[in-house]
Each structure stands twice: as structure tokens, then as C-alpha cells.
Amino acid sequence: MNELFQTPQVEAGIKEYPLMPLRDIVIFPTMVQPLFVGRRFSIRAIEEANKKDKLIFLVLQKDKDVEEPKEEDIYKVGVVAYILRTVPIEDARVKVLVQGLKRGVIKKLEWKEDHYVAQVDVIEERDIPPESQTIEDKALIKAVKESIDKLVSLGKQIIPDLVVLIKELEEPGKLADMVASILDIKSSQAQEILETFDPRERLKKVYKFLQDEIGLLEVKQRISEIARERMEKEQREYYLRQQLKAIQEELGEAGGIKAEIEEYTKKFEEVKECMPEEGVKEVEKNIKRLERLHPESAEAGVIRTWLDWVLDLPWCTRTEDNYDLERAREILDRDHYDLEKVKDRIIEYLAIRKLTQGKEAPTQILAFVGPPGVGKTSLGRSIAEALGRKFVRIALGGIRDEAEIRGHRRTYVGAMPGRIIQAIKQAGTKNPVIMLDEIDKLAISFQGDPAAALLEVLDPEQNKKFTDLYIGIPFDLSEVIFICTGNRADTIPTPLLDRMELIMLSGYSEEEKLFIAKKHLIPKLIPLHGFSPEEIEFTDEAILEIIRGYTREAGVRNLQRQISAVLRKIAVKKLQGEKGPFNITPELVRKLLGVPRYRPEREKKPLVGVATGLAWTEVGGEIMFIEATKMKGKGSLVLTGSLGDIMKESAQAALSYIRSKAEDYGIDPDIFSQVDVHVHVPEGAVPKDGPSAGVAIATALLSLFTDIPVRMDVAMTGEITLRGRVLPVGGLKEKILAAKRAEIYEVILPAKNKDEVMEELPEYVREKMTLHFVDNLEEVFKIALVREPKPLKEA
């Protein structure tokens, strides 16, 4: 090969060269080979070689997966090579073309700055010229050349010029190196040839590997012939299967399907006693069918998948419940603040389970409904931990196909079990805690109603024999504790809601958020951002600044995000050299987080035709302004602000009440036919509905027609009748907290809600609020208007 490229002569003796480890290829003397180089130290070795005489020492790694090999990770014997060409390619890699020159042995290896340098003892190889060869040598050389012809005839792809070159070589050492470079052998075997300095022995090893490769090619050819004879008129797919079968016969692996059947049978015996009778028959039938089918057929694949699912289900496996009530209370108190009703309900459940051990306890499905971020999902995890059970969460938001719940029939391509059975398999026990998250956001489509499919799952009378369409065998779900979560109860289908025990979770007050931030969020977030507890201290005022100025939510999810934002910015300051400890004050919060996003929403001065109402949405309580104005017209009522039908009817009822009492409030009755009234609720892009704005609409309309301003430091809620009665509404705790957030400390509420408010509202919130409980609109107007309207005769 030296005739093809101009390469320098390398003298024997100790020389120093840059060293490049190779992952899985061995370069032999005279061998020309392209290499793709990506490791930085290898690229530097090439650069150093190119600066000098383009000579580099190439040596094989013992383990190709080692990224930064040390001295013990590489072999001692390698090849001094000449770099013929270097071409940079993408991704900062280079492609080099090298030619092996002479063998060498590493005497000393050093790391110089950023690459290896080796002291190499270059070997002066003494080959055996034709005149010095024995008859055995010549016979071996001839046998090797004939074997090359045999390889080519068996389909081995070798460059024709290389075959000619091999035929011309008469020295055993050079012939061995040339043939070794084209053999399909492991890198460790190639290294063994490289380390054989004796040319005779080297050629013998090459001949052995050559015969092994010829043997493999002959077997491959024989397998092809056997398969071709059996193929007849079948398609290519059948031909490939026959080849595989012939390979299995040649290797003695035809018993693979038998081992598979034995494994399925063993698994079946382990769960057989816990399966229903129809399930036992179905599994036995499918195992027998699998035995008769061709292992590569499509039907066999379907049966295998089904058996894998069925036999991996925890038919017999269950966890033991932990009935320690004190431990359960500790876990619930540790992970969640307040939520006493929920905690008491869990303790009650545990108490019943403990008292009915060995008997069938009544199954209860709990449903946690409340705004985002109040701890519904995490509460499920705590319940599972308190009970000592596995926990699995199923996200139901946006699911519109009942097959997601009940599974697909096996006849469909790509069929799978539904999410319930998948959750059971994931848990690995038949009595986990399964959380059905966002159950209020299930959708209906032409593919069916997933809410209807859940009826069987959540009904204690039916779920003992829940049948997934894919599995086709009844599975007992009666031991599973199902916990559902949602933001609104009114969007959960009534039949589904009827199967649940509804537990309402309200939003947190400012004081509760402060406590949660100090006791839970901040201690958890400080180490997550790389600080020790001693380095960071939040003042109460700083936390309140974040709560009031940068969050507007019922839960604490956004509060956690804002605290994280503060800690991230403090982390940057620390890395820039600022010394701790860091004391987080309101001023620092404003500096780090910028201008507060939320300001108190209430108007300061009393306004005519504007009242402050209270709304309850799925994200918590909010205040909303009801604006009313009039213009010349014919007595029509215009309503805007993306209002629902119920809210429009409330506005109509409020106007009718004002008209019926016009003279009592000093209003000329004729004016109603001479003007149009327009009622608007700002934030028109947000849909609004419900009867609870009736009180606020009536107040705004009375203010409009009497020109008496409405107090802006008073908020109100309540449904009204045409007689002026104030009826009870829901979500009062959230509404009162919304008023408090907006710095409105006086609230008008229906009298029939008084007991509920007094029970649910924390005392520290009640102390700061002035709550007016009213029965009719007369009482509302006395409180909400800056002065009482006078009857028409008096006016």
C-alpha cells in the first residue's frame, strides 16, 4: 500500500508521538482507513501530529463506552500511523484518513495539557522472504489466498483491487496484516492479531479466523437454500419466516415458543385461585390457542399482549391497611393546613375500617371540590400514605372517549385496556387509592360519554365485577378507594355526583396563606434553590406583600411560584458575590418582582349607578362591579358583559322591583317608558352567570334612578325575588375572602346564610369584617346607599 500514498519511513526505536485511543477498530500496518473523530483530546492529538510530521500512535480501548480512557483502559500494542488527510465536518468533529505504518509498544504514557503523548518502542518487523520460507509457510500462504477466493464466491464484499493486492503478497506477515483488515471479527480478536509479532503465528491466527468466517457464510448460504426450497409460491414475508425457522433449527433454538408457553402457564397458576371462573376458562383457552399458532403470526402477537396484561394484573396482591389513627392525623396535619372537615372524614373512614376488620365495610367515594391550588390532589397522596396504600392518579381533563375508561375491544388494531385497569396494573395491588383528577372536565363526543362509563366504576354495587372491554374478565374494584377532584360541582353529571360524598374545599384567607407560606412553602423551597435555612429569612410583611401585590387566587400555587421567583433572583445575587444572610423585606420584594400586578379593586368614592357585587367561580371568589346607565329611549333593558340567562333574568327582576316601588323611592313612574337602561358587568370576555348578583343589580338600578351614590366600601351578594326578598346563595366563604382581598371590610349577605357563614368563616376573618345579614332589599338599600331615598310625595 505504500506505493499508493507517499508516507515517511519510520525507524525502529523509542519515539514520542501524540496518542489517539480508538473505540472499536484496530488499524494494521499498510491499512488505509477513514476515521470520524469527535472527542476533544483525540482532535487535539491530530492537531499536534499535523503540526509536526503527521505521525500519530493509534491504539485500541479495552472498553469502547469509556469516554475518557486512562492508561489502564487502553492496550499497550498499537500502530504508528500517518495522517493522509484531515477534513473538518459538522458538530466540531473531524474526518481523518490514516495509513498504518509500523507496530509499536507503549513504554510511557503522559497527559500533556489536553491530549495524550506516548513514548513508543517502534518494532522493526522481520518478515520471511520467499527464499527463506518452508513448505509449510508456502502452503499456508496458498491456503489463505484460496480462502479469500472462497470468501468472494460466498458473497463477501471485497474491493477487487484489494483482492489483486493480496494475491501479489508473498510474505506471511504482510499478508496476515492485509487479510486481518478485511475480516469481520471482534476488535479484541483483531488486537490479538496485532499483538502477534511472529509473522508465521500471525498468519495462522488469521487463517483460523478466515475459516470461521467462511463457515458462517456457508451456514448462511445453506439456510437460504433450505428456505428457498420450502418457499414455493409464498410471498417474501413467508420466505423470511422460513429463514428464521431454519436459523432456529441450525442453532437449536426451536423450543422458544415452548418456553414462552411454560412462562405463561407458571404465571397463570400463581393467580388462578383469585380469578373468577370465566376468567380461568378464558386464559386457559388462549394459552392453548397460542400453542397451536405460528409464533410470528399476527394473531399470536395479539394473544401474547392480552395474556401479558391479564396475568400481570394484581388478582391476589393487596396491601395491608394501617389503622393507626394518630399516625394518620400526623401525616394529614404535616402535609395540609386547616381542611379539618376533610381530615375528620378520613379519620372516620379509618375508624370504621378498623372496627369492621374481616367484614365488608361500606364503600365511600369521596369528591373534593374547590378552586385550584387548595391541595385537592396532594390530599389524595396523603390519604394513601396514611392508609399505607399505593397511590395512582388518573387525569380525566378533556377525555371524550368512553374507551379511555372502559378499554377498547380486542378486535381493534392497537387495542388497550382503559385507564382504570392501567392504574390497577401500575399500582401493583388490588386495593390502591385511585384519584380521578378533574372529573368535572369530562367531555362528551360521538365516541361516547366517559362520565356514563364511570358510573359502573364508582357504584359500590356494580364495581365488584367491573369488566374492561379489552380484558374481558370481571375485576373486583370494591377494595379500591376512589377519590374524585374538581373545581365545580355543577358541571359533574348528576348520576355521577349521586355516587359521591361531596366535600367542599374553600379558598385560603390571607392569614392562612401567610401560615402556609411560613410553615410549608418556604421551608420546602429554600433547599430546592440551593440555600440553607440560615441564609434566607422572609419577614411576614414581605410574604404579605407577595400575597397582596403579586397573587390573586384562592389557593397557594401562584404564591409558591412568586416565592420561587424571589429565591431565583437571590441565587443570582449570591453567585455574583453578594454575601448572605438575605433578609427578604417588602421593599426587596418590590425590587425583585417589579411593579405589583394587583392593586385593591374597590373604588374609593361613592358612585351613582355602580354597585360592588361578589361572584364565586371555579378559581375562587371575586368582586365584580355592576354598572348601570340610562339614555333616552322606549323603556328597553340592555344587558352586556357576557351574561348568562340566569343573570339576565335577575336583572329583569331587579328592574321590575324598582318599577313596582318607584313612588316609594321618589322615582317618577313615567320615566321608565322614556329611557333605555343599560346594565354592564366589566371583563366582558369572561362568561358570568348565576342569581347571586341580583342584590347588586337592584342597588345599582335604584342608585341610577334616584341619583343617590352607592357606597364603594360595601360589597353584596344574594338572589332577589319580585317581592324584594333576599334569598340564600352559595360560595360565601370565597366571596367574603374576595372582598377582604379587595380591602372591602363590609359585606351584605342573605340572612338565611348566617349559620353557614358563622360556621365556615374563621374567627380571625369575622373579627375584621362587618357582616350585614338581610332579609329584603329595603335593608340592603339602607346600608348600601349613602342616604335613604325619600318617597315621591315627600321628595
UniProtKB/Swiss-Prot annotation:
<keyword id="KW-0067">ATP-binding</keyword>
<dbReference type="InterPro" id="IPR008269">
    <property type="entry name" value="Lon_proteolytic"/>
</dbReference>
<dbReference type="InterPro" id="IPR046336">
    <property type="entry name" value="Lon_prtase_N_sf"/>
</dbReference>
<dbReference type="Pfam" id="PF00004">
    <property type="entry name" value="AAA"/>
</dbReference>
<feature type="active site">
    <location>
        <position position="692"/>
    </location>
</feature>
<feature type="domain" description="Lon N-terminal">
    <location>
        <begin position="17"/>
        <end position="214"/>
    </location>
</feature>
<dbReference type="GO" id="GO:0043565">
    <property type="term" value="F:sequence-specific DNA binding"/>
</dbReference>
<comment type="similarity">
    <text>Belongs to the peptidase S16 family.</text>
</comment>
<dbReference type="GO" id="GO:0005524">
    <property type="term" value="F:ATP binding"/>
</dbReference>
<dbReference type="InterPro" id="IPR003959">
    <property type="entry name" value="ATPase_AAA_core"/>
</dbReference>
<comment type="function">
    <text>ATP-dependent serine protease that mediates the selective degradation of mutant and abnormal proteins as well as certain short-lived regulatory proteins. Required for cellular homeostasis and for survival from DNA damage and developmental changes induced by stress. Degrades polypeptides processively to yield small peptide fragments that are 5 to 10 amino acids long. Binds to DNA in a double-stranded, site-specific manner.</text>
</comment>
<dbReference type="InterPro" id="IPR003593">
    <property type="entry name" value="AAA+_ATPase"/>
</dbReference>
<comment type="subunit">
    <text>Homohexamer. Organized in a ring with a central cavity.</text>
</comment>
<dbReference type="InterPro" id="IPR027065">
    <property type="entry name" value="Lon_Prtase"/>
</dbReference>
<dbReference type="InterPro" id="IPR027543">
    <property type="entry name" value="Lon_bac"/>
</dbReference>
<dbReference type="Pfam" id="PF02190">
    <property type="entry name" value="LON_substr_bdg"/>
</dbReference>
<dbReference type="Pfam" id="PF22667">
    <property type="entry name" value="Lon_lid"/>
</dbReference>
<dbReference type="GO" id="GO:0004252">
    <property type="term" value="F:serine-type endopeptidase activity"/>
</dbReference>
<dbReference type="InterPro" id="IPR015947">
    <property type="entry name" value="PUA-like_sf"/>
</dbReference>
<dbReference type="InterPro" id="IPR054594">
    <property type="entry name" value="Lon_lid"/>
</dbReference>
<feature type="active site">
    <location>
        <position position="735"/>
    </location>
</feature>
<keyword id="KW-0547">Nucleotide-binding</keyword>
<keyword id="KW-0645">Protease</keyword>
<dbReference type="InterPro" id="IPR008268">
    <property type="entry name" value="Peptidase_S16_AS"/>
</dbReference>
<keyword id="KW-0963">Cytoplasm</keyword>
<dbReference type="InterPro" id="IPR027417">
    <property type="entry name" value="P-loop_NTPase"/>
</dbReference>
<feature type="domain" description="Lon proteolytic">
    <location>
        <begin position="605"/>
        <end position="787"/>
    </location>
</feature>
<keyword id="KW-0346">Stress response</keyword>
<protein>
    <recommendedName>
        <fullName>Lon protease</fullName>
        <ecNumber>3.4.21.53</ecNumber>
    </recommendedName>
</protein>
<dbReference type="GO" id="GO:0006515">
    <property type="term" value="P:protein quality control for misfolded or incompletely synthesized proteins"/>
</dbReference>
<keyword id="KW-0378">Hydrolase</keyword>
<keyword id="KW-0720">Serine protease</keyword>
<dbReference type="GO" id="GO:0034605">
    <property type="term" value="P:cellular response to heat"/>
</dbReference>
<dbReference type="InterPro" id="IPR014721">
    <property type="entry name" value="Ribsml_uS5_D2-typ_fold_subgr"/>
</dbReference>
<dbReference type="InterPro" id="IPR003111">
    <property type="entry name" value="Lon_prtase_N"/>
</dbReference>
<dbReference type="GO" id="GO:0005737">
    <property type="term" value="C:cytoplasm"/>
</dbReference>
<feature type="binding site">
    <location>
        <begin position="370"/>
        <end position="377"/>
    </location>
    <ligand>
        <name>ATP</name>
    </ligand>
</feature>
<dbReference type="InterPro" id="IPR004815">
    <property type="entry name" value="Lon_bac/euk-typ"/>
</dbReference>
<dbReference type="GO" id="GO:0004176">
    <property type="term" value="F:ATP-dependent peptidase activity"/>
</dbReference>
<dbReference type="GO" id="GO:0016887">
    <property type="term" value="F:ATP hydrolysis activity"/>
</dbReference>
<dbReference type="InterPro" id="IPR020568">
    <property type="entry name" value="Ribosomal_Su5_D2-typ_SF"/>
</dbReference>
<dbReference type="Pfam" id="PF05362">
    <property type="entry name" value="Lon_C"/>
</dbReference>
